Amino acid sequence: LIRRTIVVEQQLAFPEAIHQSEDALFNMQMLEYVKSVDFLHETLTTYRVWGMSSFQRFHADLPQQMEQVNQQFLTFGKVHHKGDFYWNAYEVWLMETYIRLLKRYFYHPNNPQSEAEKKRAWKALLTTCPSLKQLRRASWKKMYQSRKSYPLLLFFLLYCRCYALNRRVMEWLLRTDRY
């Protein structure tokens, strides 16, 4: 694990892949030892050095990088037979990372896409991303209990569910020739 203090003191420069890996390792460690989803949120927002994170810059391949990291988390949890604490924390971490992706990728000031292109890309991500399929299955009750003061998470899940429902209704209408 790369220690942040050494990186800051020695003013070392690493490529973005190292920063991404460091983010993943930090979060993996937190998911291992945390016993409360609320504490995970507090730790991520309070004790995190965001300046060294790759989420601060615009990258065209950021959604693909995030999906690779998420798949590693899923594989790690399944291989090591993690319990409910891990999976609850993983769902919240996943929501927070996709909210950060929404802010840092789709609404980034350096994003060259037009508003229509951003909306199409977001909808494509919602339908094709395996991690977001897991988020759509997340429990409303669990999310409400763990994040009462985080309305953006509610909006995020509501948007995912509404889009998925709308898609299912359209598929049904097309299948039954009622559209």
Regions found by a protein language model. Give the residues of each.
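Conserved nucleotide-sugar donor-binding catalytic segment
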Residues: 1-60
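Catalytic core of nucleotide-sugar-dependent glycosyltransferases
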Residues: 42-50, 56-84, 97-104, 108-132
